[in-house]
């Protein structure tokens, strides 16, 4: 009996000293790594387009914009959004539903999102770019100082330090898209997240989890892509999901197998 109790206590001690913890909760509560999609499962052009979206392409970032214009009832059209752009003048934002759009229609808003032109339907043909979500109200939503969002990163179960300044926001209520775009930009720059194996892309699977102060979470499988072009790859942001930035942190899990 004493031997059994000693073995049990030893096992518990080893578990506590070897399992990475975040805010007192083991990382295993968030994911089942076996359910993550593999990079090799992506459609032919998806990987290169994900690389373009999250690392190379410009983002639509502005403050204090207002529009009553629409193409469909679930959209807002910002005319003259782009200045000096070689192709686009206007930005058409798809918010997924009439109710979601009415929340921002005619109000001062801030925009932060990834836009695309190919397969963009609405506005002036060939002069309008499209974007899913990325909208927050401007008034009473500004922090007194920019917040740097802490990031916990595990690579194959081993915790790795991430500089504190890689994901930032000046908003109290921020879209998950704004945070996700910054986080994936860092991951690709540091680890070649969306590079092919032949170009040094060692990461094969991954998950990003956003934890709010209220205890709610939002997560994305980093390789669970819809289709292979931006008009479908970016659709994950159509719900314009937002999260409170107070006590917010991000957990990242990368796997090389």
UniProtKB/Swiss-Prot annotation:
Disulfide bonds join 120-130. InterPro entries: Enterotoxin, Staph/Strept_toxin_CS, Staph_tox_OB, SuperAg_toxin_C, Superantigen_bac, Toxin_b-grasp_Staph/Strep, Toxin_bac. Gene3D superfamilies: 2.40.50.110, 3.10.20.120. Keywords: Disulfide bond, Enterotoxin, Metal-binding, Secreted, Signal, Superantigen, Toxin, Virulence, Zinc. It comes from the Bacteria. GO terms for molecular function: metal ion binding; toxin activity. Residues 1-27 form the signal peptide. Binds 1 zinc ion per subunit. The zinc ion is necessary for the toxin interaction with MHC class II. Zn(2+) binds at residues 211, 249, 251. Its cofactor is Zn(2+). GO terms for cellular component: extracellular region. The keyword Ribonucleoprotein does not apply. It is found in: Secreted. Pfam families: Stap_Strp_tox_C, Stap_Strp_toxin. Belongs to the staphylococcal/streptococcal toxin family. Staphylococcal enterotoxin that activates the host immune system by binding as unprocessed molecules to major histocompatibility (MHC) complex class II and T-cell receptor (TCR) molecules. In turn, this ternary complex activates a large number of T-lymphocytes initiating a systemic release of pro-inflammatory cytokines. Also causes the intoxication staphylococcal food poisoning syndrome. Interacts with host MHC class II molecules composed of alpha/HLA-DRA and beta/HLA-DRB1 chains. Interacts with host T-cell receptor beta variable TRBV7-9. This is Enterotoxin type E.
